[in-house]
Every structure is written in C-alpha cells, then in structure tokens.
Amino acid sequence: MRKSFASLRYTATHTASMQTTLLKTNAMKSRTLRLADTFFFLLSAATLWAGEGKEFVTVKDGRFYLGEKEYRYVGTNLWYGAILGSEGSGGNRQRLVRELDDLYNVGIDNVRVLIGGDGRDGIPSHIAPKLQTAPGVYNDTILAGLDFLMMELEKRNMRAVLYFNNAWEWSGGYGAYLDWVGYKGEVESSDGSGRKFFELTPVPSIDGWWEYMQYVSNFILNEQAKALAANHVRKMVTRRNRYTGELYKDSKALMAWEIANEPRCFMNDSLHKAKFVEWIDEQSRLIKSLDPNHLVTTGSEGKHGCEDDINLFKAIHTLPAIDYACIHIWPNNWGWIGQFNQNYDADKTIAEDAPDPIVENVQAACDSTIAYINEAHKVLEGHGRPIVLEEFGYPRDRFLFDAGSPTKGRDIYYNYVFSIISSSGKIAGCNFWGWGGRANVKHTIWQRWDDYVCDPAQEEQGLNSVFYADKSTLEIIKKSAQALKKR
C-alpha cells in the first residue's frame, strides 16, 4: 500500500528520533539474527553429528589422526566453494548445499578450496569474481561465502584444506602480487624472436606459457610481493566466522592451511631454489604462529613442481612448520599418455573409428603414477610426514567433456589410484580433481557467470571434472571411500 504525501511529512526532530530508534531496532534484530544463525548451526550440528568431529587432525609417526583413530580419506577439489557460498555474483548457496550433500553421500569428507583469487578483472582465462581486488581490499560476499561453506562442512563432519595463493595464472596468484608492487620485466621469447618487455604479468594463452613462467619466477625474489602475500595469510588465518562466531583457528571443519596451489620457483638455478625454500619456511612459520591448532602444508606437485629436483621436494617438506607432504599427478598434462592434448585452443576430440589413447595408454599412466609415488615416499621415509595425493585427474574417453560421456579410461585409472591408497600405506589420503557435480555446463570454454566446475577458466569445462551424472566413476569413489573408513 502507498502512503499519502501528508502521512510522510514529519518534523526534522521527529525524523531524527525515528531514525535513531530504527537503527537501534535494526541493530537488535541483526544481533538476534546472528544469534539465531549460531543457535541453529549448533543445534543442527549437534543433531547430525553428536559426539563426532570434535578433534583437530594431527600427525603422528607419518600418519593422520583424529583423536586416537587414524584418519585416511578420499576427498575432492572444490576450488570454487567460497564463491559458490557467496550471495553475490557467482554465488549459489542452494547448489552448494546440494553438492555437499552429494559429496557426503558418496563418502567424501575432505575438500580442497581456494581462498585466493587476486588482481585485475576482465581476463578471460581468470576466475571471477576475485576475492582480493587490490592489496588488502576484499570482496566481502566471498568472505561470507567461505564462512557459509565452513559452517556447512562442519554440519556434515567434513573438513577443508584451504590454500592462499597460486603459482598459476587462473586465479591471479603470483602475477597479481607482482602487478600490485609495480614489477615490470623482460623475458626471453618462446619463439626465438629475442626478449620481450612486460609491464603487467603475461597471460599464457596470449603471451605464452614460457613467457609467463619466466616472469612470475620473480615473485619469490621480490620482498614486497611476498610481504603482500603474508598480509593475506594474516587476514585469513585470524578470521572469525560470521555465522558460527568461531575463529578459524578453532574450527574443526579445517584440516590444514596450504601455502599455495602448486607453488614453484620456476627456474632451475640455486638462487631461485634457495629463495623458494626460504619463502615456504617463512610462510609456514607465519601460519603456525597465528594458528598452532591446524596442520600446514605446501600445495606442491612433488618433484615435477620442484624443477624435477627430488632434493628440493624433500627440502620444502622437511621444514619444521610443514606437517605433511603433498603431490599432484597429471598423466595427461605431463605427456604420460601422449602429447596430442597440449593446446587448449585446438579440437582434441578423437574420431570414433580411431584408437583412443586415453583408454589404450591408461596402463602407461598407472606405471608412471606408482613410480612417481614411490620416489616421493622413498625420499621422505623416516621423516614422519604423511603424503597426500591432493590432485589427480584423467580425461574422459576420446577427450569428450560432457557430463555422463564415457569414462572407461578414467575409471580404470581411478580404481588403480585408490588401490594404491588402500593397500600400500604410502599415501595417507587423496583429493581427486575435481568435483563438477550438478553444474549445467553451457560452453566448452568458461564464460562469465557460467556454472562453476573444477576445470578453471583456461581449460575446457568438463576436462577433468567428475559430474553427478558420471555414475560409474561415482560408484568407484564411493566404494573406495567406504573401504578406507572400515580399515
């Protein structure tokens, strides 16, 4: 109903009084709603998980524990979890809740989530929206999304590994911090045409991957850029969840803090390697000083992410504030099943009447996988660090991307990886890459505000994602998760 003009004519004094009263009333309502949110969170958590999930994950003698019970897990990557939990652009809380329910029902109790997303907007190969748009300037809707995600995880007795930074370009990462401190530099051209000068971080899909890697290798040499990254760590580790009222350092839904996604020094020289170890040491000690309750790890790919230097891998994972080691395995990206697939702008689908290398070469992928795991385990043996395979992925048959399309090769590979975790004792847990769930994929290459899947914006959507429609893969995951929990 519209009020008459006369009914809206009040004196300035009366208006001010009413505004003051309204502000007080709204403040009381806000506090009441926050208390109600907290109450219903605690009530639902107590109802669903009475007596469970009260401990932090710890490490003892190279194993994870929850209280006195060994903790082994099958998890997934859900880098977009905080964005999906937002009520702003890109957010969809209804979908997030449903995805978490699906994950729980499959037996997945661990998710690896990005708490970065940095720098300039408008780059097609970057995720959107960004969490940190300028140094210390944060998108509060995504922070709220992270709080919501952590609350929902705790309700389900699930745990998160949260990573702050990224060596790769798809979330900003190294390059964003260099841009913020005004770094400019020259790199060698990948086409042999000489040297190129860049005022901002090169975009790999436009300027070249070799150009990008040379440029961002300067991150670990740049004290100003690293200082900004440390400020981001302080911001996130000291955060209080707006829905539960709990400090993150006290959260049982948090398993570990992770320094970066696939941190690298990107150059195979002694200076870069030494500075890389120094940075991992500084960041891990900083995190531990702010939060002594939770585990800390690197986010490393393993030897492959350490310039193929196994001793560098060992050095960063035996630092005092690093609790466990991680490795990633990518048979497709690393050429273990052939080199046909390396140009993201090419049509890589395989004709129906042609042999499918994704299926035919899966044994080669399995052989290389166990060799990679064995090497990591051998170099860390006796150091008391569990190893987590926190990323692994495999394409769909014939390099298709659609949900529900054949996954014979992937299913064989997943089965093999899970069998290693179950039987060898060399891997304490894993997170497959990654969860696409119930996303409605509209484009092969991500367009702004398309549904998120686990394939970042620079990759084909569906390349490595596991969808809810992938029933044979989900059954393998479910059986493997259940088997680990029974051990």
Give residue spans per PLM region:
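Histidine-centered catalytic/metal-binding microenvironments
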Residues: 487
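Bacterial Sec-dependent N-terminal signal peptides
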Residues: 1, 7-52
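Active-site mouth of glycoside hydrolases
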Residues: 53-339, 344-386, 392-483
